[in-house]
Amino acid sequence: MKTDTAIEAGCHRIAHAIGSASLARYHGDVTRAFAEGSASCWSGYYHGILEHALIGAQTKAQYAAVARRVCSGASIRATVWLAYQCVHGLGHGLMLQSGYNMPFALSICDRLKTDWDRSSCTGGIFMENINAANGSAYGQKTQWLKKSDLVYPCDWVKSRYKLYCYLMVTSRILGANGYDWKATARICAGVEKGWVATCFQSYGRDADGSTRQNASKVLSLCALTGTHEGDCLYGASRDMTSNYSSGKQASGLCAQAPAGLRARCFYGIGTILGNFDSSSSAHEAACRELTRTYYAACLRGTGD
């Protein structure tokens, strides 16, 4: 993949297609299909499985029944990491199978069993909405974007939906403004009260993804955010840890960050590491392997 930039750039959507085909191969067995995949390319494989799982649902009741069932398997719920990939992928599938009917898709997320599931599901919806704007939505279009307001729909949706919308909003902004990072930072600084930090975390996630996890480039982009550099590095370290399913690469980023921001950066790594395994001993071992100086910050991030 590293030798073909076109494939590398589109690997998330390619992985979606592979995941969808895998579910067909295993005759709709979501648990088995999940067991055969990995988190490469920002977990596109997992997301694709859920896109395919909703094929055949027509009524709201049918969508809701499938949505509550597909991510309930014990092996999927074994870790927060896998459960999140499943429920997030469900959000993608709801958008695609409903023809980008965002209010409908959100209403199905609302019918999941827990607050965590409901919130995580919305992330897939907002990511898929942005995919439509950035030309990776299988030819479908969305009406839930505005050229005159690049933050929309985050500044329009109900408060319970805002978190994951703002965690992805800069993908929309950057795609629309030609990756003008300084302009994007200005937009984040001006979003509605209470969501500025989240917008800059999104900026950090995009800094990591757009540079293909190049630590020096991420640091340069985060430096453009001024007083929000810590939020940027937090978002970048989380994204890097998620993409590699490991904190090793992200720890290199954090080690090069400004000294006063390193603890926050390692804390970000910990928030993702904590999802890979539920045991405190595993959290301690993972953080100890990465850093001595910022071990406590990493461990706090895991929830221990």
Q: Can you name each region flagged by the protein language model?
A:
Residues 1-304:
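Non-catalytic all-alpha helical scaffold/repeat segments
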